[in-house]
């Protein structure tokens, strides 16, 4: 067996704190990453799409979730436009305080 050092990549300090608390409580890396929004990585840097993913997810859940979408309606088109706007917003100027830590 090869020993692979794993690291956790968290989107921000809150995610890091949740991850660490979970791990201290005996949670597995995978479970704690799932709860905290962190990722388990073997590289020394977070994946390049990581900040965009969380930006888009947060934007869509906070701004687009309230749009009700009956099938084949104009409201459905509004939801699509909202999601596209979030994606465009997050494509430019996304900066986060990602935290990487050895596990």
UniProtKB/Swiss-Prot annotation:
A Pfam family annotated for this chain is Thionin
GO CC: one term? extracellular region
Please name every pair of cysteines joined by a disulfide bond in this record.
Answer: 9-46, 10-38, 22-32
Q: Name one GO molecular function term.
A: toxin activity
- What are the entry keywords? Disulfide bond, Plant defense, Secreted, Signal, Toxin
Q: What does this protein do?
A: Thionins are small plant proteins which are toxic to animal cells. They seem to exert their toxic effect at the level of the cell membrane. Their precise function is not known.
Family label? Belongs to the plant thionin (TC 1.C.44) family.
Q: What is the protein name stated in its UniProt record? A: Viscotoxin-B
Q: Which gene encodes it?
A: THI2.2
């Amino acid at each position: 067996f090869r020993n692979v050092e794993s690291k956790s990549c968290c989107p921000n300090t809150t995610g890091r704190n949740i991850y660490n608390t979970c791990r201290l409580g005996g949670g597995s890396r995978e479970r704690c990453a799932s709860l905290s929004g962190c990722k388990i990585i073997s590289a020394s840097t977070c994946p390049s799409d990581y900040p965009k993913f969380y930006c888009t997810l947060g934007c869509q859940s906070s701004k687009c979730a309230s749009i009700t979408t009956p099938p084949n309606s104009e409201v459905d088109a509004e939801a699509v436009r909202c999601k596209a706007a979030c994606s465009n917003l997050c494509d430019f100027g996304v900066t986060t305080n990602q935290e990487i830590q050895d596990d």
